Structures are given as structure tokens and as C-alpha cells.
Amino acid sequence: LIVSLLLFLISCSKKEEDSSSTSSTVTCASSRTLTASTKVPLLVVRVQYANATFQSSQTTWADKMFGTSDGQLNHYLDETTYGKYQFTPATETSGCTNDGVVTVSMAENHPDTQGNSWACYAATAITAADSSVNFSAYDTDSNGKLSVAELQVIFLVAGGESAQSINSPGGVWGQAGSLTCDVNGDGGIVDEPCGSTPDNCHGVTLDSVRMLGMTSSTYGQNGFSQFGERQGNSPIDTWDATIGVMAHELGHAYFDLPDLYDTSAIGAGIGYFG
């Protein structure tokens, strides 16, 4: 009788463990039907650090970036481009396979670059993401480079969005640009070792393709965009970044749109509309 009771209790305990394990299973984003005439591949690289980890799940961000419901990026693009453009998830094997989001964890603390360049850290992050993505598959014209149209890459960095003065435990400034990294730390990039081709001064080579470098016709790479995870009114009153900053930076990165607000500090841009 005692043995039977013990076996019963062990069985109950095992069922509770199984139940707990099941309840903690990650729920992946459901498949979506995109209706735009042009579907642009987009890879979202979530980057977290030893002292700055994400407060929302990978699926939360996959929904926000690729979802088609009100308040999600593809819904906004569908409306504003009159059904011409949407972003489709890049093929990857991280976490929820093929939801377009790869999460990488850095061993060091957040670099807290704020308004300074985060490009060298972007190079490290995209290299860490390489094991989950076959970048060569996006080189559709087989020229050894990824262009703006072939693949967009946006980095979502755990911590704050410095453009809103949220820098705890570290912040980056939302922006779009190209990966030009001051490897030798002298404050400039023009004297970086380029080897036999200027292309080596910017971008990175992964899976035998050059990427994230300058987007001009001379170089023809895809650049990248970035933003901080948390926006807010103060360091103690924050929330996940809304789609405004994502749409804005991807507007620069893919559509090559200008800023409509004043960037010279001597004018008013186009006023309140911008």
C-alpha cells in the first residue's frame, strides 16, 4: 500500500512538471497572408546584453514587425503604399523558425553608444546571427553583395531608445545607415585596412556575400537600420518601441526617404506634419 501511494505521488508530481513545461512552451506567431505587390525580405536581429535583456518575447516583436493588424507595421505599409509594399519575414532557424526574427545574446554589457556609432557592435551581432541565416540565398543576382531590395536588416537592441533619452541600462539611437566600423579606434574610417578593394572598408562578408555596407551605386550594399527596445517618458516609465520608429528608419533604409523634420537646427522642416 505504501509503495502504491508513493508511486501515485510520483506520478502526480511528474504530471505537474509536464504541465508546467507545456505551459511555458513558446507560442510562435501564426502565418500571415501578405497582399502587397512587392514583398521585401526583412531580417530582425534582436541583440541583448549581459545587463540588458528583452522585456517582451520574440513573438511579440514578430507580430509587431510583420503582422497585418491595426497597429502593426505591415498594416501601416499596406495603407500608406496603397497595397504596393510589405515586409516578409526572412528565412531563419532561430527560436520560432522563419518568423523573421533572430535573437543573439552578447556576453558583455550594453555598450551604451547613445548618439555615437553602434556599427562595430552591429558587425558582431550580424556575425552571431549568421548561424541561423543563409545570407547567400538572398543574393538573387549573384553579384556577391546584398542590395537594398534583396534583404533589409534591422537591429532591435535591448535597452533604451536614446532619441527619447531612455538610456538605462544602455541606449542606442534609432537610425539608418551603413556599416562603417572604426576597427582601429582612431576615430575615423577612411584609413581602415581596405586590402585590394574599397568594399573592405565597410560592410561584412558572411556566407560569401558582402552586406550592410554603403548603399550608393558605387558600392551597392544594403546598409541597415537600428532602434532601441524601450521608449518612454522617463527611465521608470517605459514601453516597447512603437511602429513609428520602425517605419521611419525602414523608410530611410529601403525607400531612401528623407527626414521631414528640421535636421539643421536653423529651420522648421515642414512643420508639425513632419
Regions found by a protein language model. Give the residues of each.
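Metalloprotease/metallohydrolase-associated module, dominated by Zn2+-dependent proteases
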Residues: 272-274
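Bacterial N-terminal signal peptides
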Residues: 1-8
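Active-site-proximal segment of zinc-dependent metalloprotease catalytic domains
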Residues: 25-269
